[in-house]
Amino acid sequence: LKCIGELSKRISCAAARPNLSFQNPDSIAAYYMEQLRHQEQEIMICMMLDNQNHLLNDTILSKGTVNATLITPREVYLEALRYHAVSLILVHNHPGGNPVPSQCDREVTERIFRAGEMLGIGLLDHIIIGDRQAVSMREQGFWLEPSKNKG
């Protein structure tokens, strides 16, 4: 019965958000804040978007420890390809409450960004949720320039 309740909740949430789109990082942070800010472990979510930046689906890619989560470009882009995503946004939490990106956050983001360039699926942002605050890596200047070596 517990599984049926969870399945029902997931179906109703999915049905309640057709063509859901976000205008800026603050609207994304607000959408995920309550889901993530009280978690005791890092959770990485991938938002998959269509060509008009409407949310196709979001999925939890990883549940980690109190200060780390393991994620690889392979896992990210398998999900993106499954939903025919044109672009994606990563969202994860820092259980300690401070949303400032760590060096590891920057390195993982760069690997995922570069893999997306090769696949033609853009990583638009990586948003980190803390306690009642969030950081957009793009807005804070922790973003990347496209590679010059294309083709």
Predicted regions and their residues:
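Conserved active-site beta-strand-loop modules that form the wall/rim of enzyme catalytic pockets
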Residues: 45-46, 88
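Short, acidic, Ser/Thr-enriched surface-loop or helix-capping motifs
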Residues: 50
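Short loop/turn microsegments at loop-to-beta-strand junctions
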Residues: 43-45, 124
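Short loop/turn motifs at secondary-structure junctions and domain boundaries
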Residues: 37-40
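Active-site-proximal loop/helix of nucleotide/amide-processing enzymes and allied scaffolds
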Residues: 30, 62, 66-151
